[in-house]
Swiss-Prot record:
Belongs to the protease inhibitor I3 (leguminous Kunitz-type inhibitor) family. Disulfide bonds: none annotated. One of its GO terms (molecular function) is cysteine-type endopeptidase inhibitor activity. The keyword DNA damage does not apply. It is found in: Secreted. Inhibits T.cruzi cruzipain. Pfam families: Kunitz_legume. One of its GO terms (cellular component) is extracellular region. The lineage of its organism: Eukaryota, Viridiplantae, Streptophyta, Embryophyta, Tracheophyta. This is Kunitz-type proteinase inhibitor BbCI. Keywords: Protease inhibitor, Secreted, Thiol protease inhibitor.
């Protein structure tokens, strides 16, 4: 089914910017954080002090105007001040399979947005196959890192950046 934003409008493919608004996790928004001894912040986090947070765009190479639950997607931060804006998942101590930004985008992205309770969740499909891992939150160093986990998914609503 079609992915809808907070006003019931279909989420657009490769066009608009959206906030991911946590459903069950209090206030906060998406941000980038350093992990390990990285020079630049590349780990995607939910930061309670950063709201409404950074905005994302959903992209599928299909020539279609809207996003549905069945599409494999690239997710990227827009606008971005760096070339590293595309979400991917990589092993990162001590988080596990962390969602991080990279400057390389695969033609068909590894994520899908799927309905979950009152909102949506992101599911990571490493080989674009049938089996996916929910993107949840891993609490480390006072931050909530987005990571592919077996635990509770990060559930959010999708709010278009241009809405008041």
């Amino acid at each position: 089914s079609v992915i809808l934003d907070t006003k019931g409008e279909p989420v657009s493919n490769a066009a608009d910017a959206y906030y991911l608004v946590p459903v069950s996790h209090g206030e906060g928004g998406l941000a980038l954080a350093k992990v390990g001894n990285e020079a630049e912040p590349k780990a995607v986090v939910l930061d309670p002090h950063h709201r409404p947070g950074l905005t994302v765009r959903f992209e599928t190479p299909l020539a279609i105007a809207i996003i549905t639950e069945s599409f494999f997607l690239n997710i990227k931060f827009v606008p971005s001040s760096s070339d590293s804006e595309v979400w991917d998942v990589s092993k990162q101590y001590p988080i596990g399979l962390a969602v991080k930004v990279t400057d390389t985008k695969s033609f068909v992205g590894p994520f899908r947005v799927e309905k979950e309770g009152e909102g949506y969740k992101i599911v990571y499909y490493p080989d674009r196959g049938q089996t996916g891992l929910d993107i949840g939150l891993v609490h480390r160093n006072d931050k909530y890192y987005l990571a592919a986990t077996e635990g509770e998914p990060f559930v959010f609503k999708i709010r278009k950046a241009t809405y008041e």
